[in-house]
From Swiss-Prot:
Major location category of this protein: nucleus
One BP term from GO: regulation of transcription by RNA polymerase II
Pfam families for this protein: zf-C2H2
Task performed by this protein: Transcription factor that acts as a key downstream transcription factor in the HOG1-MAPK pathway. Regulates the expression of a series of downstream genes and controls vegetative growth, conidiogenesis, cell wall integrity, stress response, mitochondrial morphology, and pathogenicity. Binds to a putative promoter region 1500 bp upstream of the start codons of the target genes MGG_07019, POX1 and DCI1. Binds to the AGGGG and CCCCT motif of the COS1 promoter region.
Zinc finger map (C2H2-type): 420-448, 449-471
Organism domain of life: Eukaryota
Subunit note: Interacts with HOG1/OSM1.
Compartments, as annotated in UniProt: Nucleus; Cytoplasm
Gene knockout outcome: Leads to excessive accumulation of lipid droplets and restricts infectious growth in rice. Results in fewer peroxisomes, more lipid droplets, and higher levels of phosphatidylglycerol, phosphatidylinositol, diacylglycerol, triacylglycerol and free fatty acids.
Protein name according to UniProt: C2H2-type transcription factor MSN2
Length: 548
C-alpha cells in the first residue's frame, strides 16, 4: 500500500588545507522521505438500493456517475476541503481597474471594491493594498483624547453667547427690537462720536465698519434719548393709571368698625352702598352647627305641602327687603307647631340632637351678645329649638336617651323581635337563656360552671368548654387497675396472651406486656401542663407553658 520515493543525494564542497587535495565533496544525509497514498475513488454517501422487480417497475440505476478526478498530486498536502474550480486574484491591477467601467455593462458580478468600515483598518477587506489610511472612530469616547493633558482648556469649555442672554438685553421686555448688548452699543456710540478733547487713535472707529463680521448685531445707528423712550409699552395697554389706587384716608368709620370685628366688607371706589354685617354668622359655632345638625334642617324642610306652597314660594317686594333681617316671632311659632308634631312621632335620636343644641347654645361665646339691637330683640333659632325639645321632655311623651351598649351589635333602632328585656340596663334579647347569661355575667357575677381539673369557675358554659381545651388532649391511661390487682393478674397469667395460639406460626414475636404501655401513657398524661397553678383566679389569660 505504501510506496517510498528514492532519496536524492546531496553533496557539499569542503576545504581542507592539510591534505593535498584542496576540496572534496562530502555526502550529506537526505531529507526524510514522504509517504504517498494512492488516490481513492469517491463513494456516494447515500446507498442506492434496487427496487424489486414488478410489472410497472423500471430497472434501477446500476451505478452513479463518478465525478472526474482532477490531476492533483497524491501527496497529503494540507489544502482546503472544497477545492475551487477557478481562483480569483485578490489584487486589482491598474489596467483592470481602467477597464471596469466598460466591462460593467457587459458582464455581471464586476463591481468596485467595497469600502472598508470605520471600525476596521484600511485595506483589510477588499480594498487595494496600496491604499493606506487610518480608521475613523465611531464613538469619540474610544478616541483616547480625553486623557491627553496637552489639550487646551478652552476646547472643552462651552461657548458663551452674551448677545442671546436676557440679562444683557438693552430693550424693554416684549418689544420687537434687536437684542443688542449694552456694552457693544456704548462702544459703537463712542466710536461714531469721538470726543473733541480726547486724543484717541483713529484706528478704533473704522474697525467696526470695515469688518462687519466682528459684531453679530446690525450696523449701529445714532439714536437720541427721545427715540429710545418713546416706544409703545405693552404694559400701558392693560394697566390703567397708576394713581387710581385705594387710599386709606377714604375709608369710612363704619368700615373701620367692620374690620375690627374681623368681617369682610367690600368698599367700592365710587362710594357705592355697602351691605351690613349679617349677625347670624358672627360666631363660628353657629355656622358650624348649621352645617353639622342635619336633623334640624330636615325637620324645617319637611313641613306640610300647604305651608311650602304658601310661605316658601310667595316672595313679594316686602319680603325681599326684609331678607337680611331675622324672621319674626310669628314664623317661629309656626315652626314650633310643626316641630312638636314631628318630635312626638320620632324616636330617641331626635331627643339627643335637641339636648345637644341646648347645651351648645348655653356654651356659646360672648360674641353673640355683641349683636345689633334688631337681632337682640328676637330669640335665635337655636334657643327656640331647645325650648321645644324641653317641652317635649316635660310632657314625657319622648323616649329616654339610649345608654352606652356593650357588645358587637350597636344598632340605634330597637328590634321588635327582642321580647326579653333587662330591668337593670334596659337591654333586650331574643331568648330567655341569653337574658339569664347577661344577668350572671354583668349584674350578679354568678359563676355556676366549674372546671373539674383545676377548679376554675365560669359564668358561661361556652367559656368553660373553651377553657377545658387548655388541659391537653384528654388522654385517659389504660392502666386503671392498682398495684395489687396487677400483681394478682400477673400471678394468674392474665397479663400475657396464651402462647399456644402462636405455637403453630413460625417467626412470630410474642406480644409485649401491657403493663409497660399503661405506665408510659400515665406518665405522658401527668406531664401534660395545664394545672391550676398556671392560671390565676381573676380570669386573666396566660399562655400555656410548654415543657421540652
Amino acid at each position: 500500500m505504501e510506496s517510498m520515493m528514492a532519496a536524492h543525494p546531496m553533496y557539499m564542497m569542503q576545504y581542507q588545507y592539510d591534505n593535498r587535495q584542496h576540496a572534496h565533496y562530502a555526502h550529506l544525509p537526505s531529507q526524510q522521505p514522504m509517504a504517498f497514498y494512492p488516490a481513492v475513488p469517491m463513494v456516494p454517501s447515500t446507498p442506492t438500493y434496487s427496487r424489486p422487480a414488478s410489472a410497472c417497475s423500471q430497472p434501477a440505476m446500476q451505478s452513479m456517475k463518478q465525478m472526474p478526478m482532477t490531476s492533483y498530486p497524491s501527496a497529503m498536502t494540507p489544502m482546503a476541503s472544497p477545492q475551487p474550480m477557478a481562483r480569483r486574484s485578490n489584487i486589482v491591477l491598474e489596467t483592470e481597474a481602467c477597464d471596469w467601467e466598460g466591462k460593467r455593462h457587459q458582464a455581471h458580478g464586476i463591481y468596485y471594491p467595497s469600502t472598508p468600515p470605520l471600525s476596521s483598518s484600511g485595506s483589510a477587506i477588499s480594498s487595494p493594498e496600496s491604499c493606506d489610511m487610518l480608521s475613523t472612530p465611531m464613538n469619540p469616547m474610544f478616541s483616547g483624547l480625553d486623557s491627553i493633558e496637552s489639550i487646551k482648556p478652552e476646547v472643552n469649555s462651552p461657548e458663551s453667547f452674551p448677545v442671546l442672554e436676557w440679562t444683557s438685553c438693552a430693550s424693554p421686555p416684549m418689544t420687537p427690537v434687536y437684542l443688542n448688548n449694552v456694552n457693544n452699543n456704548l462702544h459703537s456710540k463712542q466710536n461714531l462720536r469721538p470726543a473733541p478733547t480726547s486724543s484717541c487713535s483713529p484706528e478704533l472707529a473704522p474697525a467696526v465698519s470695515a469688518c462687519p463680521s466682528l459684531s453679530p448685531s446690525p450696523v449701529p445707528q445714532t439714536r437720541s434719548f427721545t427715540s429710545e423712550t418713546s416706544f409703545c409699552d405693552p404694559r400701558n395697554l392693560t394697566v390703567g393709571n397708576v394713581t387710581l389706587g385705594l387710599e386709606p384716608a377714604s375709608l369710612s368709620t363704619e368700615t373701620l368698625v367692620a374690620q375690627a370685628d374681623n368681617s369682610f366688607v367690600f368698599v367700592a371706589p365710587q362710594a357705592a352702598p355697602t351691605w351690613d354685617a349679617i349677625s347670624e354668622l358672627e360666631s363660628e359655632e353657629d355656622f358650624v352647627k348649621g352645617l353639622v345638625n342635619l336633623d334640624d334642617s330636615k325637620s324645617d324642610a319637611q313641613g306640610t305641602r300647604t305651608r311650602a306652597s304658601s310661605d316658601a314660594v310667595s316672595l313679594n317686594f316686602d319680603e325681599v327687603e326684609a331678607f337680611p333681617l331675622l324672621p319674626t316671632a310669628h314664623t317661629h311659632s309656626d315652626d314650633d307647631c310643626h316641630k312638636s308634631k314631628r318630635q312626638r312621632t320620632c324616636g330617641g335620636p331626635k331627643m339627643d340632637s335637641a339636648t345637644n343644641e341646648s347645651a351648645s347654645s348655653a356654651a356659646a361665646p360672648s360674641s353673640e351678645q355683641q349683636q345689633q339691637p334688631k337681632s337682640s330683640d328676637v330669640p335665635s333659632n337655636e334657643e327656640t329649638k331647645s325650648n321645644s325639645g324641653a317641652s317635649t321632655n316635660s310632657d314625657g311623651t319622648g323616649l329616654p336617651a339610649p345608654t352606652s351598649r356593650r357588645g358587637r351589635k350597636q344598632s340605634l333602632t330597637e328590634d321588635p323581635s327582642k321580647a326579653f328585656k333587662c330591668e337593670l340596663c334596659d337591654r333586650r334579647f331574643r331568648r330567655q337563656e341569653h337574658l339569664k347569661r347577661h344577668y350572671r355575667s354583668l349584674h350578679t357575677q354568678d359563676k355556676p360552671f366549674e372546671c373539674n381539673e383545676c377548679g376554675k369557675k365560669f359564668s358561661r358554659s361556652d367559656n368553660l368548654t373553651q377553657h377545658a381545651r387548655t388541659h391537653g388532649s384528654g388522654a385517659i391511661p389504660l392502666n386503671i387497675m392498682g398495684e395489687e390487682d396487677l400483681a394478682a393478674a400477673a400471678a394468674n397469667g392474665y397479663m400475657h396472651p396464651p402462647q399456644h395460639m402462636y405455637s403453630m406460626v413460625p417467626n412470630v414475636p410474642t406480644l409485649p406486656d401491657y403493663n409497660s404501655y399503661g405506665k408510659v401513657l400515665f406518665q405522658i398524661a401527668a406531664e401534660v401542663p395545664g394545672s391550676a397553678s398556671d392560671y390565676s383566679d381573676d380570669g386573666s389569660e396566660r399562655k400555656r407553658k410548654r415543657t421540652d
